[in-house]
UniProtKB/Swiss-Prot annotation:
Location relative to the cell: Host cytoplasm; Host nucleus
Pfam families in the record: Pap_E4
The organism's taxonomic lineage, starting at the top: Viruses, Monodnaviria, Shotokuvirae, Cossaviricota, Papovaviricetes
Assigned keywords, A-Z: Early protein, Host cytoplasm, Host G2/M cell cycle arrest by virus, Host nucleus, Host-virus interaction, Modulation of host cell cycle by virus, Phosphoprotein
More details: The major E4 form is first synthesized as an E1^E4 fusion protein from spliced E1^E4 transcripts, such that the first few amino acids of the E4 protein are derived from the N terminus of E1.
General function of this protein: Contributes to multiple aspects of the viral life cycle including viral genome amplification, suppression of suprabasal cell differentiation and egress of newly formed virions. Induces host cell cycle arrest at the G2 phase by associating with and preventing the nuclear entry of host CDK1/cyclin B1 complexes. Inhibits cellular DNA replication by preventing loading of host replication licensing proteins MCM2 and MCM7 onto chromatin. Within the cytoplasm, associates with host kinase SRPK1, a splicing factor regulator, and inhibits its activity.
Cellular component terms per the entry's GO annotation: host cell cytoplasm; host cell nucleus
Protein name, as recorded: Protein E4
Biased amino acid composition, Low complexity: 46-55
Compositionally biased tracts (Basic residues): 22-31
SUBUNIT field: Assembles into oligomeric complexes. Interacts with host CDK1. Interacts with host SRPK1; this interaction may favor expression of late viral transcripts. Interacts with host cytokeratin components KRT8 and KRT18.
Post-translational modification: Phosphorylated by host ERK. The phosphorylation triggers a structural change that enhances keratin binding and protein stability.
The organism of origin for this protein: Human papillomavirus 28
InterPro entries found in the cross-reference section: Papilloma_E4
Length: 97
């Protein structure tokens, strides 16, 4: 079976679109940490970092979304994805539904 029939059969399956996770609701007041304990840990942390005189490093960036360049539908319940990451890694993923 060729690629075009699979894309026509599943038009909403856009695997190249970036995926954004759903937004989380804020924690209720009883689930938040107490301000007093938070301030204590912050003051201890700031003293340790001031002695080293180093600027805090930003957290590492999340990798970019992988791009699916080619996918095929094999039979009624098997999909094969050919994934190419921006770093050059190539992965073939076969999913049996």
């Amino acid at each position: 079976m060729d690629d075009t029939s699979a894309h026509e059969k599943y038009p909403l399956l856009d695997l190249c679109a970036p995926v954004t996770p759903p937004r989380r609701r804020p924690k209720p007041r009883w689930a938040r940490p107490k301000d007093r304990s938070k301030n204590d840990s912050d003051s201890r942390h700031s003293t340790g970092s001031s002695s080293s005189d180093s600027t805090p490093k930003p957290p590492p960036r999340k990798p970019l979304n992988e791009q699916v360049n080619h996918w095929t539908l094999q039979g009624p319940a098997t999909v094969t994805l050919h994934v190419h990451t921006p770093s050059g890694t190539q992965v073939t993923l076969t999913v049996h539904l």
